[in-house]
Amino acid sequence: MQDRFLKSIANLPEALAKAIVPMLDKDFAGHLDAQQIEELKTASQLTEQDLLLALLPIAAALARVPISEFYVGAIAKGKSGDIYMGANLELAGEALFHSVHAEQSAISHAWLSGERQIEDVIVNFSPCGHCRQFMNELVEGQKVNIHLPEQKTQPLSHYLPYAFGPGDLNITEPLLTKQQHELSLDSSDPMIIEAVDHAGLSYAPYTKNYAAVVLETKDGVTYSGRYAENAAFNPSMLPMQMALSNMARHNRDFSEINRAVLIESSKGSVSLVGATMDALHAVAAVELEHIVVESE
């Protein structure tokens, strides 16, 4: 079991702790499939809602919060029945807008894993306005059930009434709908190919800047992030922050970054290169490879 979960395990019901410890191996990064959830329900004798609430300390252990020291864990449950954990991320000494919220982390985890719809979000503190707006961008976002400790389960519409969302801007394929943008680049570099593939899957209906970041560690492992825009603009999640959140979930240190690539579309009305470089240089002494590709 990874050391970062030791304190969390001590706070779990004994039967649940015993059942989940074998799942928290060196490769665990916050994903449990539907079958594992059923196994944990059987072993713990908890209802699914109580189980997911009980697992929040595990999710919160994924956080990196050098500024606030305030650990927030979130779990996104997909239509598939799988769950995806996430936690907040802060960059030491850097502006707060670089931060990733736990709900963003969990939802991006689900998105990168191929999930097409989020049905439930479980979180250990009430979602802030930023996160409510971020979740409202999802497929049927207003119907997403929000679960909080000692609170009645309510749909997002309860927490964000009279919401402004993608429908108000005539967007009919919201976040997590499969995106397939054709981007053209001739390269034999596996890392660049991976970045182009993720950029083609990014969600940027407002600026058309289909973009992605891939980070490579010194042992050759890659971690990706895609651009996820929001109708309210500011809650958009940048690909570098998504990639860093991805690394944090996998328990990798940012000092291990050996290479970083940003791909973005030539037809976008904005560029992410400045913000991406700021975040990268805050965590690693690596130069950003910035490639603009043609969109078909």
From Swiss-Prot:
Co-factor(s): Zn(2+)
Catalysed transformations (reactions): cytidine + H2O + H(+) = uridine + NH4(+); 2'-deoxycytidine + H2O + H(+) = 2'-deoxyuridine + NH4(+)
Annotated GO MF terms: cytidine deaminase activity; identical protein binding; zinc ion binding
GO BP annotation list: cytidine deamination
Residue positions binding Zn(2+): H101, C128, C131
Top-level division of the source organism's lineage: Bacteria
DNA damage among keywords: no
Annotated Pfam families: dCMP_cyt_deam_1, dCMP_cyt_deam_2
Catalytic residues, chain numbering: E103
Binding-site residues for substrate, renumbered to this chain: N88, L89, E90
Annotated cofactor note: Binds 1 zinc ion.
Subunit architecture: Homodimer.
HAMAP family (UniProt xref): Cyt_deam (MF_01558)
Family: Belongs to the cytidine and deoxycytidylate deaminase family.
Protein name, entry field: Cytidine deaminase
Taxonomic classification: Bacteria, Pseudomonadati, Pseudomonadota, Gammaproteobacteria, Alteromonadales
Gene designation: cdd
